[in-house]
């Protein structure tokens, strides 16, 4: 169980670094919407909703809600 959590955290950190590098392109590509920051990109990629901060992005990624 711990290994799964660690793997998830690693994946999220890699996505966050990609977001910082590509300016939200990854989130836009996967979520189908424009993203300009790390939180928005992450939320758009997994939750498919607009997010403008890291907390919102995480919420969109996990629950698909604000």
UniProtKB/Swiss-Prot annotation:
Renumbered ranges of Sequence repeats: 22-37, 38-53, 54-64
Keyword hit for Amino-acid biosynthesis: no
GO molecular function: toxin activity
A Gene Ontology cellular-component term: extracellular region
Signal peptide boundaries: 1-20
Maturation propeptide residues: 33-37, 49-53
This protein's UniProt keywords: Amidation, Cleavage on pair of basic residues, Repeat, Secreted, Signal, Toxin
Keyword Secreted appears in the UniProt entry: yes
Tissues/organs with expression: Expressed by the venom secretory cell of the spine. The spine is a cuticular structure containing a single large nucleated venom-secreting cell at its base. It is an independent unit capable of producing, storing and injecting venom. On the back of D.vulnerans caterpillars, spines are grouped together by 50 to 100 to form scoli, of which there are eight in D.vulnerans.
Chief site of localization: secreted
Protein localization: Secreted
Biological function: Probable toxin.
Assigned protein family: Belongs to the limacoditoxin-59 family.
Protein name: U-limacoditoxin(59)-Dv128
């Amino acid at each position: 169980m711990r290994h799964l959590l660690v793997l998830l955290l690693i994946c999220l950190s890699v996505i966050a670094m990609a977001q910082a590098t590509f300016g939200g392109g990854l989130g836009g590509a996967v979520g189908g919407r424009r993203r300009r920051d790390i939180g928005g990109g992450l939320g758009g990629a997994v939750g498919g909703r607009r997010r403008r901060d890291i907390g919102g992005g995480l919420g969109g990624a996990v629950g698909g809600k604000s």
